[in-house]
Design a protein with these regions (language model features):
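N-terminal membrane-anchoring alpha-helices
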Residues: 1-30
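Binuclear metal-ion centers of metallo-dependent hydrolases, dominated by the metallo-beta-lactamase
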Residues: 129, 133-150, 254-327
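Active-site-proximal loop/helix segments of hydrolase catalytic cores
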Residues: 185-258
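Conserved beta-strand hairpin/beta-sheet module of binuclear metal-dependent hydrolase folds
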Residues: 33-86, 197-217
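Pre-active-site segment of Zn-dependent metallo-hydrolases
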Residues: 55-99, 104, 109-113, 168, ...
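Active-site neighborhood of phospho(di)ester-bond hydrolases with catalytic His/Asp-centered motifs
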Residues: 59-62, 94-104, 123-126, 214-219, ...
């Protein structure tokens, strides 16, 4: 009996609960795409491919899903097969850029290999460049940017705004991944997830003739940062937001959605960091959720935000399929 109970407990802890979003929020996949439309494809977490038919570029480019055992042993590394699979499913051809939203492993670990395979420029903080150097990416294939700097990618103008990362509930993680923010030398994998320091947490403001949008990868904020950046669509990172206080969540909403006045909010970074890339989008593994906390609180809060803002189009994205951002 004891063995059965142990097996049941392990099955539960290492299983995936329902995600903290409602299925009916999912945007439809585009069946017909006008030649000049701007589209987005979502691979999971905050990896997205944007295209206007002329130019493709990507946030994060993270496709590897390290196992818990690899994370525990400090042995995470890019998985070339997963990267090839993800790029193929996204129909990523020749990318203008891959832009990690910060330098943690679940954003930047694969980005240099994505750049190498697609011809993209790797753009980000110095920490991101040191991830690229550790994987042998040539210096001319990387660009280090600072707060307020803009990069032109075809008709897309991307402006980098330095924000803050959400603070984890675990003080040790805060110290190792946020307070110690720099990667001071080329990072050669396999490595610990704690070696993938924050670097800088970017919010991207993207201007295009068809419409403007913001991409917020981490549920952190700087008061007043987004004042004056009104946009049509806001991609809102909500990872681990349920672990924060109700006051923090209210402030986060006000400093993002409240500041930018979007017509549409698209949720990102709500799915599991461990579930297979070739499966459906899942909630975080229960044992990982116990560490980050708040999956149910996040779901309740998102439902409440949607109900309180009926004028907003409130969406998630299908996996890998194109969705119309601006027809």
């Amino acid at each position: 009996m004891a063995m059965l109970l142990l097996a049941a407990a392990l099955w539960y802890l290492f299983g995936y609960p329902a995600p903290p979003v409602d299925l009916q929020w999912r945007a439809p996949a585009a069946t017909q795409i006008p030649d000049d439309a701007v589209t987005v494809r979502f691979a999971g977490t905050s990896t997205m491919l944007f295209s206007d038919g002329e130019t493709q570029w990507m946030t994060d480019g993270w496709f590897t899903r390290p196992r818990l055992s690899q994370i525990a042993l400090g042995q995470v590394a890019p998985d070339p097969a997963a990267i090839e699979f993800g790029l193929k499913r996204l129909d990523a051809q020749r990318l203008a850029a891959v832009i990690p939203l910060h330098s943690h492993y679940d954003h930047a670990m694969d980005a240099p290999l994505v750049a190498e395979r697609t011809g993209a420029l790797l753009i980000g903080a110095e920490a991101t460049a040191n991830i690229g150097r550790g994987l042998g990416l040539a210096e001319e294939r990387m660009r280090v940017v600072e707060h307020g700097e803009s990069v032109q990618l075809g008709a897309f103008r991307v402006t980098f705004l330095e924000s803050r990362h959400l603070e984890y509930a675990d003080p040790d993680m805060v110290d190792k991944l946020i307070t110690q923010s720099e990667i001071p030398a080329p990072l050669v994998p396999p490595a610990s997830i704690y070696d993938y320091k924050l670097g800088k947490a970017w919010v991207l403001h993207v201007a295009h003739p068809k419409g403007d949008f913001l991409v917020i990868g981490s549920a952190g904020f700087v008061p007043g940062l987004l004042d004056g950046y009104d946009v049509d669509t806001l991609f809102l990172g909500v990872g681990a937001l349920g672990s924060q206080t109700a006051e923090y969540r209210a402030d986060y909403w006000q400093e993002t959605v409240g500041a930018a006045h979007p017509e549409r909010v698209i949720l990102i970074h709500w799915d599991s960091l461990l579930a297979p890339l070739n499966g459906r989008l899942q909630g975080e593994m229960r044992i990982a959720g116990l560490l980050s906390g708040g999956n149910e609180r996040l779901h309740e809060w998102l439902r409440a935000r949607r109900a309180a803002n009926p004028q907003l189009v409130f969406q998630t994205l299908p996996r890998f399929e194109p969705s119309l951002l601006f027809p």
